[in-house]
Amino acid sequence: MKRIKDKIFSIALIFIVLFVFNSKVIANGLYIGTSTVDITPELPVALDGQMHLRIAEKIETPLEANIVVIESRSNSEKNEVVIFISCDLVAIPLEIIESVKLEVKKIAPEIDVNNIVMNATHTHTGPVVRFGLYAIPKIGVTQIKDYHTFFSKKTAKAVKEAWDSRKPGSVTWGLGFARIGHNRRATYIDNSAKMYGQTDIPEFQSIEGSEDQNVQTLFFWNQKGDLIATAINVACPSQEVEHKTVINADYWHPLRQKLRKRFNPQLSVLGWIGASGDQSPHLMYGKAADERMRKLREIDRLDEISRRILSAVEDTYEVVQTERQNYVPIIHRIEEVTLPMRIVTNSEYESSKKEILKIETQLKEDPKAIEQLFRRLNSFEGDVIKRYEKQKNNLPIYKTQIHVVKIGDIVICTNPFELFTEYGIAMQARSKALQTFVIQLSGPGTYLPTEKAVKGGHYSAIIQSTLVGPDGGQLLVDETVDFINELF
């Protein structure tokens, strides 16, 4: 009789243990869904990123949007969700964000579209997505609004696919290193600065700012142990082939190819560009030595860049793959930040007026030059005039939305700018998180320079290039760090 009672007790104990274990799974279960979609535009198409109009009639590589849905389920608390969408675009205009959300609502009303976090890889060989920058021909070229519609419908469908594919999974993270970005602003003995300025002249003094050589990676697995997605944070825009007149995803394309060959043909790869408004893959010095090494390896610059990132990711993977976590709590905060806009001075206003007069004179002599001068006339100089008139009534402010996502002991934070690297480093240094992933261009862009850069001048730091100045940059850092540290 005693044996029977002991057996009953043992069986009951097993059921209790299983119940407790299953409750833990339900309470903190991590569910992951992924998808990838081709967002290559129909040709011919105008290209975004340069000051002049370029019309592409050739596709060198496809463009992609990669989606990862992460959900932390709990039977005692509200489920937390974040939907990351990384796009081979120059920026993410507000019109595109709203259009994608609207399309997702139509086909998947169960999805809370406020959880969508989009970012651009900042390729300069992708379609124009921002209105008012170029004199795009009305006939024979893909129109911006048509691409918006095409992109939004395809991306929304891919979001639904990722949402519907959610299954239990695991995640881990790690840190590697590779020199990808190079600070592209040279300073001189007269205290001036220049983007892509010469460094092999006696007047050259130093490279202006910092570089961030961290390669931070998130790895996502399914229950079978297959790697199904990665998120790779590199503080360098994808602009190695930026001057070409073709469709090209830049270094992310060969990197994705290498990663899919190494891990999984269906691997989703989130390309997260870190704070790198003053960075570029272009070398500022040491070009001959770099070229020699590439020739010895028999590869081009795109392969060299992707090779370095792959090496950092693989090295990180080998170290952290045994630390997969299935029960990671997620906190997703969406915050509105109000920043002071940069004030247009009288001298800046007068300078822009003079430049506009020069451009108008050029156009009278050669009306066809509008294709090359439209952006300078309408946006670059023209917006300065509009801002000067507008600020007479009220001090201008810039409102923007940022996302802060805590996953375990790491955090991801976004901003809409081409944010100079020193701001991103400050966020990482002051954050209480084990690792802090900073994602720029989670919005429409414009440079956000440091005070040193503004004093040095030139493109990326002058009034024409910026809506928000260094005081706004410091406030962005302070508020982002506060949001992060409140989660820890």
For each predicted feature, which ranges?
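Bacterial N-terminal signal peptides
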Residues: S10-V20
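Sec/Tat signal peptide C-region and signal peptidase I cleavage site
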Residues: N22-A27
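N-terminal secretory signal peptides that target proteins for export/translocation
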Residues: M1-D6
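Conserved beta-alpha junction segments in alpha/beta enzyme cores
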Residues: N28-S268, W272-A275, Q279-E304, L310, ...
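A compositional/structural signature marking long, glycine- and acidic/polar-rich segments
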Residues: K7-S10, T245
